[in-house]
Amino acid sequence: MDNREKSRLLWKCRRGMLELDLVLQKFIANEIDRLTENQLKAFDNLLTHNDPNLYAWLMGHEEPEKELLEIVSFIRNCD
């Protein structure tokens, strides 16, 4: 992944909720270089969803769509 793409994903991690900012920015800072191409695509797709859904999925209050389940589980388990 080139620096431009990394910068784009880092920018997309900046959300309107502090809680999401903390989780997403920590995740991407620690894991970006280890994610597979499919995981990067799933993460990029995840970031297209609205903050209330992201928060509910990442906090385990609701289950995400099937195609996002793997990346959401991965983010939940990264600490």
Swiss-Prot record:
<dbReference type="InterPro" id="IPR050531">
    <property type="entry name" value="SdhE_FAD_assembly_factor"/>
</dbReference>
<dbReference type="InterPro" id="IPR005631">
    <property type="entry name" value="SDH"/>
</dbReference>
<protein>
    <recommendedName>
        <fullName>FAD assembly factor SdhE</fullName>
    </recommendedName>
</protein>
<comment type="function">
    <text>An FAD assembly protein, which accelerates covalent attachment of the cofactor into other proteins. Plays an essential role in the assembly of succinate dehydrogenase (SDH, respiratory complex II), an enzyme complex that is a component of both the tricarboxylic acid cycle and the electron transport chain, and which couples the oxidation of succinate to fumarate with the reduction of ubiquinone (coenzyme Q) to ubiquinol. Required for flavinylation (covalent attachment of FAD) of the flavoprotein subunit SdhA of SDH and other flavinylated proteins as well.</text>
</comment>
<dbReference type="InterPro" id="IPR036714">
    <property type="entry name" value="SDH_sf"/>
</dbReference>
<dbReference type="Pfam" id="PF03937">
    <property type="entry name" value="Sdh5"/>
</dbReference>
<keyword id="KW-0963">Cytoplasm</keyword>
<dbReference type="GO" id="GO:0006105">
    <property type="term" value="P:succinate metabolic process"/>
</dbReference>
<dbReference type="GO" id="GO:0005737">
    <property type="term" value="C:cytoplasm"/>
</dbReference>
<comment type="similarity">
    <text>Belongs to the SdhE FAD assembly factor family.</text>
</comment>
<keyword id="KW-0143">Chaperone</keyword>
